[in-house]
Amino acid sequence: MEPAKPSGNNMGSNDERMQDYRPDPMMEESIQQILEDSLMCDTSFDDLILPGLESFGLIIPESSNNIESNNVEEGSNEDLKTLAEHKCKQGNDNDVIQSAMKLSGLYCDADITHTQPLSDNTHQDPIYSQETRIFSKTIQDPRIAAQTHRQCTSSASNLPSNESGSTQVRFASELPNQLLQPMYTSHNQNANLQNNFTSLPYQPYHDPYRDIESSYRESRNTNRGYDYNFRHHSYRPRGGNGKYNYYNPNSKYQQPYKRCFTRTYNRRGRGHRSYDCSDRSADLPYEHYTYPNYEQQNPDPRMNNYKDFTQLTNKFNFGANDYSMAFSTDSTHVQSDNYNHPTKAQTIPETTKTKKHKATKDNETSRGNQVLTSNDAISLSYRPSPIKLDIIKKIYDTDVIPLPKEALTANGSNRDVDIQKYKKAHIRCRSVQKKKERSSQTNKHDENHASSRSDLKERKSNEHEDKAVTKARDFSKLDPLLSPLPLTPEPAIDFADHTDKFYSTPEFNQIKQNLHRSKTSLQDTVPISKHTPRAPTKDNSYKKHHDSKDNYPKMKHSPGRTTSKKNTTNSNGHQNFKDVSVKNVSGKATSTSPKSKTHHYSSSSDEEGQYKSPVKTITPSPSPYCKLKNPSIMDKNSAKNHTASADKNLTDNSPIRSNLNPTAFNKSNNNKSITNSTSNSDECTDKKPNCNSTKNESKDPNRTCGKNSDKHLSKSCTMASKRAPSRASSRTSSRASSRASSRASSRASSRASSRASSRDSSRASSRAPSRASSRDSSRASSRDSSRDSNRASSKASSRASSRDSSRASSRDSSRASSKASRKASSRASSRASSRASSKASGKASSKASSRASSRAFSRNSSRASSRASSRASSRASSRASSRASSRDSSRALSRAFGRDSSRASSRASSRDSSRASSKASRKASSRASSRASSRASSRASSRELRQIYCDSNKRQTPPHDTSINTKFEISEIKFRCGEDLNFYKNTAARLQCFNHNDQFYNPRFRPHIRTNRKKSESTNDTDSESSMSRCKSHCRNSPDSLTIVRRKKHKSGSSSISSSIEENCRSNSHIVTGKEKFTPFYYQSSRTRSSSSSSSSSSASLSCSKSTLKTCRKTQNRDNKQIKSKSDSKHKTTNMSSDYESNRHADVFRNSPEAGEKFPLHNSSPFNTHEQSNHSENAIDEEQKKAPNITTSHLHQKQNVKLHNTKKCKKKRPRDDDSDSSIKNFCKKRISGAQKTESEVSEIDDLCYRDYVRLKERKVSEKFKIHRGRVATKDFQKLFRNTMRAFEYKQIPKKPCNDKNLKEAVYNICCNGLSNNAAIIMYFTRSKKVAQNIKIMQKELMIRPNITVSEAFKMNHAPPKYYDKDEIKRFIQLQKQGPQELWDKFENNTTHDLFTRHSDVKTMIIYAATPIDFVGAVKTCNKYAKDNPKEIVLRVCSIIDGDNPISIYNPISKDFKSKFSTLSKC
């Protein structure tokens, strides 16, 4: 149908045209209802009908037939009421409807022959005159039209329908004018979803019949005084001021219509913030990148060029509707506008999270019942409200997934581009299709819908593949899209294995074996916390760290294998951290049988809107720990082996262990730090805040071990995370474990009393814990933990604790454990106590062993004997371990012992030892806590979080291999549920994940963000050393290390893993803490880069174990020699990481896959991480006092300068230097604090780039004796030295332009009717005031047509040179010969040997296509130049053969010239 001419604002013609109008019955009824309610109820009519007119002063009485541009008549409310009542009384129902539509803006008076569509836009007529609509040759931006159409929140719009009654859908290309598009809405009332605009990114129109009145009221209540021009994104880009990433011209999130004015200067990018059309279609007219030139036709203040843009209403800013989304939606499911309004509360992550979660919970049922039918994908660049999640869900069920081809390539090992993520997305998509086939299941797993255990059973009854697929599908349904939107509710399904870590084939095999061993019934045995919060999704940045999610779903594996995958990811510690920890993160770790998939209650608010990976996926695979849980009476050797192997796997694959062991899994879930890994006690210790809450582990690992009883641990951990451990389960588990652990612990404690006590305690503790853990955890995990604990604890503790514990191992162990537990308890009584026990055990591996032994001993022996043994063992162990092995041995022992012994002893001695040891540990811990409490108290919250974080990092680190094993079948493992997956239309372009963002940034704009670094860097000794030093320094100095760690997560090929691990660690730490104060790491917000090696070293440090302790000692000596071997670097990393771990500066994590492989056992044990981190903090101080830290000695010997610089630089963000004179340096620029690899070390070894530059500058300054202040302008050698500093001018060294000369010059330029041969040059200095003025000037200029304004740019200056008379004479002679001779014979080979300098004086060039525009531009610029004569200077210059900057203006100039010539002759 061809629309007739719209009649513009002639509202009187509506009555005539209404003759042909057949109102929709439903619409008619709705409008009548509105009118009746408004007239009969207390609600005023104008409030209902005119929600937006009054705010704009655009109340349009019907009498105003011709509304001039600035003469909009304002009618009073009484007039409107009278008018409405009059109309109601006057006519029939049609009259009433007509009046209502006219007044409410539902009626669009565009002249359409057969039907009159209803338009939402109340202001459409006044804004756009009839002439504008009809004759506007410039195609209006459809988005503007769409925006105008959506002004009214009711959005009750009718499709034009033929006289025959059939609805007609108009595509954008068919519309007569872009401004008319709102009138041809894509709502097909008859066909619902069938007809949509496909060519333009329209947002679905809202259901016109749904909640009209409520929508009016909501719109009335919206805060119009708030500037909604800028949608709020959870990730504010750097310097984004709460707006989108305007500072990155390449950002796909950039909204071209947000702000009409450019960022005036200091942008190194192409184009303007809002005007960068380089990636936009050319069909948008230039004027729409500025304020439209509708001054005469637009009374609407939204289009008023002279009003402050900040006062624009949310209606104008397009923020009310996300029309960057191109998708069709079922009109029945379309939500009202209110969900699009970014409220101030939404800007606050916590508030928004809470609101959204509440809303989502409230809407769970309705959402679950909704049918996900949309076939389109959404690209979200804002945080959707809970209401909008329905649409997102639908989109997730879409069959079409816009994945780049390269994303589906078979090779998923590419770390630079997260192809695996895309593959996983693709797989997920396929699984989604499968899921669609089972649509009922899809609905069942709403994001907020918690599936019942019966549901889980039903799923389990399905094929394991289907189970995994279903879980992945359910989880991915929302998570990928929502992951960048941290405030949205979590996906319904929890995946236990959200670790980014990929296991090497041997590791995987081992894990697989363990899983098969534990295949018993993880599903039945593993309680999964319902409220498992998802691991924080750092918007896109966090996704970057969750590569392991791709690994999740090995959809083809049997449930056990699926679990193994999940566990594998968990074993990475990352996944466990996410999954298990996530559960705890919510703060409510409700243990539910694994059968019942853990349902995501919207607990993401706990994680600051970050998505915690659901633990659900854990359930399918029986955990070896589940199996071990029962065989608490394993042979000591077998248990030992199990603990060693499990420790190994769990340390590497702590998530596996935690997952495999239902208890461990619960623990990890409960503990949020996935401390479930091999040493459950360590888990508790790591999670000690949680474990202590169980209070079975009061100060000894025994309590932590209390966790080991699967139920007890899970509950205790859960409750620990909740601070409400289930004592009953802990008692039962402690009883069962206390029996076996009491035996082993009695042996261990008896041995711990002697030198062998350290070894034996490590063995016994590992045995007993291995028994307990074998009971709790799978045999494999118990083997691993026993191996690891036996190795590390027997070695480190045998050395350290054998020495000390041989002296008074029982005394020291009790003292150390009591001290550490006191410290920890003082830090966080329950958390701290668990940590303290873990720390005590952690401080001295002998402490840990002594703890375990003292725990078991206290159980077996008596409370008194447990006290004495704990004292002696803790003393000796604390002494020995506190020195050198404290960190490593505490890590290893805390892992092995903490896990095994803490499990077994926590069960067995949880009561007795928890009581006795709690008493002794409280006493001793009160002492030690007096020391550590100051540290702990200052760091208590941070430490707890950090410890948790470190633990999760540890676990994550060793197994953290970004490269997925082929054995896992990358194609199926590559599900990265949630945070890591973005379903954006242009996934690659919009993807802003940690490791994969770099390629989308122009490095010139983000010079500090480098593309993925080489793996070699991660393995560098330098990096490991620096990371060690960093860890050490942070460990000592900063309670904020966790935060720093987040910062440190950075992109690098190898660091991607580490970043994922770090991310997981964070999420784990967040989860464990259950606190929101640790905001998820946001990639964009992190400016510092940690070299991959540093991150790997930090992760390695987290993963340090007993064996690591030994190696640390060895390494200490080697480090002094600056060991370069990988093992040395690994050990260094381990040592550093112990320090670092305690420091919580896991942010240094340079989790190279190598590092993960190096410390598979050590890194993976999350428990040890906490113990070690807390212990290491204590131990660091002790070690520093007693013996120089390995890190310290090594760093001091080789990297004193480097370390200091690194420490300083780490916290500093490098500024982007535009100095062209420093191009060489620019290429070398690194994020501050990042250690250079040997290949990158330039002049001074191992200096971060910033320090290198500073040192260089210092040397140059010393050479020229330059100090702060001015330098004589005649001393060219000083001025043009090798420096990065710019010439700074507070006052511009130019004279203002003489007004008379300026006017004459402008007159002369414009006399011939051409201005393209002239330009305006603006010079201005650098200051905030000037910058603001220049921005305003730019706005004023860009409002005008035919104006071209350049970016403000700097200039690079070569040194000056005086020419002597001879050279000048030669030039004069050539000049006299004529231009040709001058050109041909001229030769000038003069050069200089100095350095160039740039100045901070900025320059801007303005062109105008016509003399009218030129004169106006000059006047505008001169106004600001006059106001700031010392900072802004104007120059007008002529251009030889000048032409317009772009050819678009050529016809304009020619047309003006021709008319000018013709008219000037008249």
UniProtKB/Swiss-Prot annotation:
Bias type Low complexity, positions: 666-681, 720-756, 763-772, 791-800, 826-884, 926-940, 1019-1029, 1053-1068, 1086-1110
Region (Disordered): 1-21, 223-242, 339-370, 428-472, 517-965, 1005-1068, 1086-1179, 1191-1223
Pfam families per UniProt: Herpes_IE2_3 (PF03361), HHV6-IE (PF03753)
Subcellular location: Host nucleus
Compositional bias per record (Basic and acidic residues), positions renumbered to this chain: 443-472, 536-553, 696-713, 773-790, 801-814, 1116-1131
GO biological process, one term: regulation of DNA-templated transcription
One MF term in the entry's GO annotations: DNA binding
Chain residue ranges for the region called Interaction with human UBE2I: 989-1037
Bias (Basic residues) ranges: 428-437, 1195-1213
Gene Ontology CC annotation, any one: host cell nucleus
Keywords assigned by UniProt, alphabetized: Activator, DNA-binding, Host nucleus, Host-virus interaction, Repeat, Transcription, Transcription regulation
Residue ranges, compositional bias (Polar residues): 339-350, 583-595, 640-665, 955-965, 1162-1177
Role noted for this protein: Transcriptional transactivator.
Subunit structure: Interacts with human UBE2I in the nucleus. Although this interaction does not promote IE2 sumoylation, it represses transactivation activity.
Protein family according to the UniProt entry: Belongs to the herpesviridae IE2 family.
Protein name: Immediate-early protein 2
